Amino acid sequence: MESKEKRAVNSLSMENANQENEEKEQVANKGEPLALPLDAGEYCVPRGNRRRFRVRQPILQYRWDMMHRLGEPQARMREENMERIGEEVRQLMEKLREKQLSHSLRAVSTDPPHHDHHDEFCLMP
């Protein structure tokens, strides 16, 4: 009987100790967080104990995460420039193809040459 009573007392004391520890953790967690992300690279400094506050590590991780999540701005600009340059090259190639085609069709056609084409020459006397 005594061993059962001792076990019951031990289990009650353990439960009380666990509840006290949980209450202490809840009180400790109610304090302000160490760092809160605001904007890119900005963090809120807590008003409490500033000795425990480490600025460098969270900011480095946050900036690294932001760079890999959003992509580097230079890389995005390079992609946009490549798309724009590719479009310009495509338009120039299309214009060049049209001019070459028009010159080849004019050489085959039977229409008399117009006087505004100074780069053409005529072999007729």
Swiss-Prot record:
The keyword Cytoplasm applies. Residues 114-118 are annotated as: His cluster. Residues 112-125 have a biased composition (Basic and acidic residues). One of its GO terms (molecular function) is signaling adaptor activity. Signaling adapter molecule involved in p75NTR/NGFR signaling. Plays a role in cell cycle progression and neuronal differentiation. Inhibits neuronal differentiation in response to nerve growth factor (NGF). May act as a link between the cell cycle and neurotrophic factor signaling, possibly by functioning as an upstream modulator of receptor signaling, coordinating biological responses to external signals with internal cellular states. PANTHER family: PROTEIN BEX1, PROTEIN BEX1-RELATED. Interacts with neurotrophin receptor p75NTR/NGFR. Interacts with OMP. Belongs to the BEX family. This is Protein BEX1. It comes from Homo sapiens (Human).
